[in-house]
Each structure stands twice: as structure tokens, then as C-alpha cells.
Amino acid sequence: MINSRSLDDLVPPAKQRAQAFVEAAKAKGIDLLVTSTYRDNESQAALYAQGRTTPGDVVTKAKPGQSWHNWRCALDVVALVNGKPVWSTKDPIWQKIGEIGKSCGLEWAGDWKDFKEFPHFQYTGGLTIAQLQQGAKIA
């Protein structure tokens, strides 16, 4: 199972935006910890099972092959305040993080209507997962 935390494992256009995002957050006094970038299908299957067939809360709606992490186009982050992660989505820091990520050309899953994922940011290059599955490449 692979669940990378390295920005180097993202496709170049996503990596560039992710690096700019982390740097822009730092410039505004927000330290971000990258918790996930590339995730293989086995890791995605384990996450998808969580809250369904294994203990825990549901944390994703994406089955293996249907996550932008599987395509090296997404990252999950959390802010560190005094060295501790801020997971509560009620904390106003998440809105700041979301705005910074969007200003760097990333889509923020905190804006999604049906299943908000505050730590999740992605770069799609205007493509869909179906297009990637058919061989399209992110530019």
C-alpha cells in the first residue's frame, strides 16, 4: 500500500500549485502538514472501506481509481498550531487555508456541496476522472 506525503509524487502541474500553496500559507503564518498526496488503489480501497466495512467514520466517497489522489493530482493538508494539528473544521483557520489554496489554482473540497473534505485540495486541469481513465493527461 502506498500513501505518499511527498509533493514530488504529484504530476508537475499539481506539484507546482501545491508547492505555491504550502509556501503562500507559510508566508501568512500558517504551517501546513501534508498528510497525503499520491495514493495507490489498495490504499484508496482501505480508506473507502472505513466506516462501511471497517471501523471508523466515512472519510471518502471515492472508490479505488476514482480519487484524484490515485491520479497524483491531489493533496490533503492540516494546519499545525503550536505543533499540533487542527482537525476541527469549525476552526476559522480552515477558511483561510481554503482561500490560500484556491488562490494558488487548486480546487478546495471544503467548497463542495454534498461531501465537504476540508483537508483536500486538487488540480484537475479541467479534466474528469473518466477522461484520465481513457488516457487523457493533465497539462
Residue ranges, per PLM feature:
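Catalytic cores and adjacent binding grooves of peptidoglycan-active enzymes
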Residues: 62-139
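Glycine-rich, flexible loop/turn motifs
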Residues: 3, 34, 43, 64, ...
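Charged/polar, solvent-exposed surface patches and flexible loops
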Residues: 12, 16, 23, 46-50, ...
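Short Pro/Gly-enriched beta-strand edge/turn motifs at strand-loop
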Residues: 55-61
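Active-site acidic/histidine clusters and adjacent loop/turn architecture
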Residues: 1-33
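Short loop/turn and capping residues at structural boundaries
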Residues: 36, 58, 111-113
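Soluble non-cytosolic domains of exported or imported proteins
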Residues: 4, 8-16, 38-41, 88-95
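Extended, low-complexity, intrinsically disordered C-terminal regulatory tails
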Residues: 22-55
